[in-house]
Amino acid sequence: LVSASLLFSVFSSPVFSNPKVLKVGAIPDQNQDVLDKRFNLFSKELSKQLDVEVKYIPVINYVAAVTGFRTKDLDLVWFGGLSGVQARLQTPNSIVIAQRDIDKEFKSVFIVNKNLELKPISNIKGLKKLKNLRFTFGSENSTSGRLMPEYFLNQAGVEIKHFKGKKAGFSGSHDATIALVNSGAFDAGALNKQVWENNLKNNPKRTSNLELFWITPEYVDYHWVAQGDLENRFGEGFTKELKSVILNLDIKQKSHKQILDMFNAKRFIKAESKQYKNIEEIGRKLNKIR
């Protein structure tokens, strides 16, 4: 859990007392440098089109993102499937704004260290080969790095107690999972498919000792969630305008393409809370939602 003093230090900047600043947040699922570049660029575009001040506020972990949204210290947050469900359940009248084109059919990957000489598997039953290995997830509250991988492992009859030491690691982010398995600190891990593919393409040294073991079936994942009372601060029609700006980011425009590329997307599309019902059900089953 995040301590009250830590949250106070994160959300005590003067920007939080200014009702005319739209505060953007995001789960810290990757290296902070990547996140800073992506969300500062996104915030700048929002500010330009909405004609309001927009500020990106980094948070230290997934719990802080959910808590910051619940306490209304964050107005618009880029959540994963699970963290978004958690945030919306804790924040009455919150609104699902949009998702990327890739989020309605998202996937995770399981990776292994090449020294294991494990061949890729073709179906879920092969996950049993991961028993008795040192295995790491990403963040404890990650959809693609923990919730869905654990769900698929369970479907194959593999529980956390079956890993070496009767426990699993939690790296904290997808990038960290790659680094830990590549170094041999862990034998295997699970992460976001897009982050895996980006590292294969752009950071070959970081993946030089890794083998793709399995790609999961599709599920719904990331989405933008906004507070339900933004119009009280920014005026009538603001939420509709905010949604329109995000949905109309156009890959044919240079500045928009730069943003969309950083989100690994061609466009943002409409999304509804009911799409995440299955994520909520799995979250409850795995005790990530109570």
Per-segment meaning from a language model:
Residues 93-103, 163-167, 200-219:
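Short beta-strand->loop
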Residues 40-51, 143-170, 198-206, 281-289:
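Ligand-binding cleft/hinge of the Venus flytrap
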Residues 20-25, 30-41, 225-226, 230-290:
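An extracytoplasmic/periplasmic, membrane-proximal ligand-sensing/linker region
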Residues 18-83:
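Extracytoplasmic small-molecule ligand-binding "clamshell" domains
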Residues 100-156:
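A conserved helix-loop-strand patch within extracytoplasmic ligand-binding domains
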Residues 78-91, 154-155, 180-183, 187-208:
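A ligand-binding cleft/hinge motif common to bilobed small-molecule-binding domains
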Residues 108-119, 220-234:
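A bilobed periplasmic-binding-protein/Venus flytrap-type ligand-binding module shared by bacterial periplasmic
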Residues 56-67, 80-82, 160-179, 218-220:
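Short helix-initiation/N-cap motifs at beta->coil->alpha
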